[in-house]
Amino acid sequence: SLKEIIEALPYQPPFLFVDALEEITENGSKGYYQLKKDEYFYQGHFPNNPITPGVILIEIMAQIGLVCYGIYLAKEKLKDQEALLVPIFTSAAVDFLGPVYPEDQLEVTSEKIYYRFNKLKCLVTCKNILTNQLICKGVFSGMIVNKDKIDQ
């Protein structure tokens, strides 16, 4: 289920950026995150004029559009090895098109480019629901690897 996918994410607050998943299919995913006005990164970026850092937007897009989607696609492997598998983010090329502020509501949509040999590549877009503005878009890649291979 979509709730189980969120529960399988290897993140915890304050670094969990998935509020809800609306849908995941073989071709893509859609999910949401609302930025809270007291997010830890607004204290320094920027005082008295908080703007969401681009690296946080990339992380939101990666968690919803790549990791949640990758967990769905790798569900057969996860049944047997859930504790042993971890997502590895390998690359992103992102265009930023507008600022994001505290309390903005983001919709992240992912479209599969390919998934093979545990590597997933997607076109991911992020839209501000409140303004209906496309905020950023990019191509993201990642893979599911066995934790034992990372520890070496």
Residue spans for each PLM region:
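Non-catalytic linker/capping segments at the edges of enzyme domains
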Residues: 1-51, 75, 84-85, 97, ...
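Hydrophobic beta-sheet segments that form the core/acyl-binding groove
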Residues: 21, 90-130
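Short, residue-level hotspots on alpha-helical faces of the histone-fold
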Residues: 59, 63-67
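Hydrophobic beta-strand-centered segment that forms part of the acyl-chain substrate-binding groove
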Residues: 66-109, 137-139, 143
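Residue-level signal for glycine
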Residues: 132-134
